[in-house]
Amino acid sequence: MRISILQLVPVVGYIGFALGELYKPKNSISCSPNNPCPAEWPCCSPYNECGAGPICVGGCNVRSSFDEESCAPIPALVASQKLEFVSTPKVPKFIVNYQPKPPIREGNGPNKANTKVGVVEGELNSKRIIHYAKFLVTPDSKEAEKMLEDFDFTHSGYTSIEASSGNIVLAMPKKTTGSLITSTRSFLYGKASVRMKTARSRGVVTAFDLTSAIGDEIDFEWLGGDLMTAQSNYYSQGHLDYTRMQRFPVGADTWATYHTYEIDWDPDRIIWYVDGKIARTVLKKDTWDPISKEYRYPQTPMRLEIAVWPGGSETNGPGTINWAGGLIDWENSPDIIEKGQFTAHVEQITVTPYQNKFTEQVQFCIKAKKKAPTFSQKDLSRVVVSYNRQDRLNHHDEGSLKWDCFVTPKINDWLSSWKRSK
């Protein structure tokens, strides 16, 4: 369910003072294509709330923001790059690994929220993970360029690195709204693979999804009260259709056992894999909506997200609580008693973008601006994509995209937007 990541995770994990008060209004302002953000808080987040600063980076929804230049261009992951996290001492990095489109085939107590540089934040930074409120928020172009080279993921909430394994731990201490990691770059078609163990207990939800700034999404989700099953769904342009959700067996306890989950997405189909076996396939041709005369199929650049969130929170609506399996027992659940928190553990992440119709355009842009016949991985780190928002209410697809190179999409400070920072 899309509410999982879009409405809960971003508000967690502030200590000392409320970071959110500095880049969001005191009283929340909702945004939509019919009700865009005001000039003073110009950027609409993926959670349909207006703000500035880090809200204008990555997942900023141009359709619901103040104007077309409020959101910063989105850092892109393009063919010949590969984003990877591994739990060994190896440092993750972009790797040359061009792949054409493939054919269809058959603990010791809770951590503090990580908003200050310290031991936990330093460990995350060493794994190329940075707090989302810091990423690309700087007036210094050189510092922003270095962030693009140095960091592959952002985090919020109670994220840490497990000392014994090097795994990413996504934690949800008692009465909090969990943790989230997000890739710093978005890609248009490719394969995303995550090897992980999910959180357990009634009402606790673990999610791995691909999501775009304007509401395209492909999901895996796991309910903590049903550890033998995974759920899948997909959405287009923010149109939530829960009838498309399908469940399938995993084969072994998802909390006790590491499994590899993959989403393979191209212009014609989506395939969900569990441990190398196809669990579900959706063909674009089967998503045609005769009423809107559109394909309800994800076809805009998406970033990877992994989260733990409280579907069974008493603050949620009854539909969400029932879907999640009921209210969370914040006092007597085994992991709360033993560790003070629910946790999911991520051992490996790999994102490999496929070649798409814009690949040659991107390469031409780099060569033309460099005035050279070749390009480097560093050159690719400054490729960006944005949306041509001529009409807020129009359906967006590949034709809505604008690609550019040698662009550093920084935001000067927590009160700025892309327009104010250029």
Swiss-Prot record:
Q: Which Pfam families match?
A: Glyco_hydro_16 (PF00722)
This protein's gene is called CRR1
CDD domains in alphabetical order: ChtBD1_GH16, GH16_fungal_CRH1_transglycosylase
What is the purpose of this protein? Spore specific glycosidase involved in spore wall assembly during sporulation. May be involved in copper import.
Question: What PROSITE patterns does the annotation carry?
Answer: GH16_2 (PS51762)
Any one GO MF annotation of this record: glycosyltransferase activity
GO cellular component terms, semicolon-separated:
ascospore wall; fungal-type cell wall; fungal-type vacuole
Q: Name residues in a coiled coil.
A: none
Q: Which GO terms describe its biological process?
A: ascospore wall assembly; carbohydrate metabolic process; chitin metabolic process; fungal-type cell wall organization
| EC number(s) on file | 3.2.-.-
Organism taxonomic ancestry:
Eukaryota, Fungi, Dikarya, Ascomycota, Saccharomycotina
What enzyme class is recorded for this protein? hydrolase
What is the scientific name of the source organism? Saccharomyces cerevisiae (strain ATCC 204508 / S288c)
Q: Does the keyword Cytoplasm apply?
A: no
| Name of the protein in its database record | Probable glycosidase CRR1
